[in-house]
């Protein structure tokens, strides 16, 4: 299968790309950083013409759309980049999907559920309305709405995956990264942890 991974050099995209290649797929990577490698395509998904060029001379059976700005605080501080990359970027990919008919896997986020204060059990997501509390979450929810709209209007096929607290090799530390990345960094550097509300809480890390 010929597969395109947008954001394929990121903390999630890079290991996904390696695994897909290990399974024998022909994998192309699109990312906005300067890099070299097999089947690498430099592209900022927020720029329509750059996205259009990805599909001019090649076809794909499946696209994993991971390219996005990450994190709630990053989104609050750099909201213009967030909306351009996340919302406009996904719309650009959807335009290509409507034209070329490839299937897609879109990585959304658990952030779309908001800050639920009760005990999180399996059916909460079915019973409690989604309530966005930050720009990052809103862009992910907007993307899901765009995807469902495209499916209704054009018959596109996309699986939406809401990832929870991803972490792993290759994730660099910054104040905008995930809580797991920050906790590990603080542990390695003997720094205190900041826990909000109280310490009588648990999460599926």
Feature names for model-found ranges:
Residues 36-47:
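Rossmann-fold cofactor-recognition segment
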């Amino acid at each position: 299968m010929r597969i395109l991974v947008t954001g394929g050099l990121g903390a999630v995209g890079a290991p996904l790309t390696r695994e897909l290649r290990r399974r024998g797929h022909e994998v192309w990577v699109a990312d906005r950083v300067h890099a070299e490698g097999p089947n690498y395509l430099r592209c900022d998904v927020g720029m329509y013409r750059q996205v259009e060029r990805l599909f001019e001379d090649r076809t794909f059976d499946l696209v994993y759309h991971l390219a996005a700005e990450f994190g709630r605080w990053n989104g609050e501080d750099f909201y213009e980049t967030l909306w351009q990359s996340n919302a406009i970027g996904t719309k650009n990919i959807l335009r290509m999907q409507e034209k070329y008919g490839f299937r897609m896997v879109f990585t959304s986020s658990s952030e779309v559920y908001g800050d639920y204060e009760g005990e999180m059990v399996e059916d909460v997501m079915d019973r409690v309305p989604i309530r966005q509390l930050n720009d990052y979450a809103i862009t992910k929810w907007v993307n899901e709405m765009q995807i469902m709209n495209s499916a209704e209007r054009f018959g596109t096929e996309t699986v939406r995956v809401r990832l929870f607290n991803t972490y792993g090799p290759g994730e660099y530390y910054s104040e905008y990264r995930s809580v797991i990345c920050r906790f590990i960094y603080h542990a390695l550097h003997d720094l205190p942890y900041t826990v909000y509300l109280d310490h009588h809480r648990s999460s599926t890390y």
